[in-house]
Amino acid sequence: MLEKLKRAIAGREGPRRDGTNALRLVDGEGDGLPGVEIEDFAGRWVVQTREGGFPEWLRGVRNELKGPRAIYWKRLGEEKEAPVLVDGEEVTEPFEVIENGMRFWIDF
C-alpha cells in the first residue's frame, strides 16, 4: 500500500511546479487504493474513507515519507464534520493554500 501511495504522490508533482500546494494526492481506485482519498492542503493531509475508520496502513506514514506536517481523517460525505487529527501538529487557525495561482484560506 505504501508503494501505491508513493506512486500516486510522485504522479502529482507536476501541479506543484507553479506553487500549487493544495491538491488531491490519492483518488481511490484510480490509484489502486479503493475507498481512500487524500487531499493535501499545504502539507496538511486530509484522508477520507468511504467505510470504516482511518486506514491502519497509513499510521506512521508521516514519519516514513517525511512529508506532511499533519494527517487528519474524515468520512467521505460528511462535509459538515471537521476532520479529526490523527498525527502531527494540530491546525488551530485558518491557513492559506495556493491552487493554480489562486489563494484560498482553509479552516478545519
Predicted regions mapped to residue ranges:
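Cysteine-centered catalytic environments shared across enzyme families
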Residues: 2-20, 49-78
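Non-catalytic accessory regions of SAM-dependent methyltransferases
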Residues: 1-44, 92-94
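Non-catalytic substrate-recognition/targeting regions of SAM-dependent transferases
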Residues: 31-32, 39, 55-108
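Short, well-ordered strand-loop elements centered on a beta-strand within folded domains, enriched
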Residues: 44-49, 105
